[in-house]
């Protein structure tokens, strides 16, 4: 969503015919990106205390829920939408350091560098393909309506929800 946040907030401004907003979309996204640094570090500290899998699952479900709803909110008060963008930015970053630490911990001795290289490659590939997918949904659905943005960001939420589902499946498989 961070890749689409300026465009979405600009759509909100146009949709509501706002002539002046208290905080520009670019400033909101800058705050979101800065908050992401802190949420990643704090998220890993929480994961150390309360469990990595638990933190990652909660962060992924929270992120998926917020982004899944966000696109349908274009008629809501601008500052409320901006606040939801910040919340999403925090939740989407909360599990970042924990996922990387988990990848290192799960790697076999002698393969940590390779594991991190693959972890990074898959992460950047998803970071490239995800926004393309959102763009396709926007294009196919018309792109200039609340429904279009709702469906586009909902598609992102659905994909994000696959993370905690995959964690649950892996956990059940390892128990069984």
Question: What name fits each language-model region?
Answer:
Residues 39-52, 138:
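Helix-to-loop junctions at the C-terminal end of transmembrane segments
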């Amino acid at each position: 969503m961070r890749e689409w946040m300026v465009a979405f907030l600009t759509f909100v401004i146009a949709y509501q015919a706002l002539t002046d907003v208290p905080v520009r979309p670019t400033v909101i996204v800058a705050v979101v990106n800065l908050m992401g640094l802190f949420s990643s570090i704090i998220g890993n500290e929480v994961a150390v205390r309360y469990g990595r899998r638990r933190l990652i699952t909660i962060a992924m479900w929270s992120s998926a829920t917020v982004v899944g709803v966000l696109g349908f909110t274009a008629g809501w008060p601008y500052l409320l939408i901006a606040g939801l963008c910040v919340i999403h930015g925090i939740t989407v970053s909360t599990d970042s350091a924990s996922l990387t630490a988990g990848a290192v911990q799960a790697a076999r001795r002698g393969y940590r560098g390779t594991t991190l290289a693959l972890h990074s490659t898959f992460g950047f590939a998803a970071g490239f393909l995800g926004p393309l997918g959102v763009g396709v949904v926007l294009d196919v659905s018309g792109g200039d309506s609340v429904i279009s943005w709702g469906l586009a960001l909902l598609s992102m939420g659905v994909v994000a929800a696959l993370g905690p589902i995959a964690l649950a499946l892996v956990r059940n498989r390892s128990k069984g």
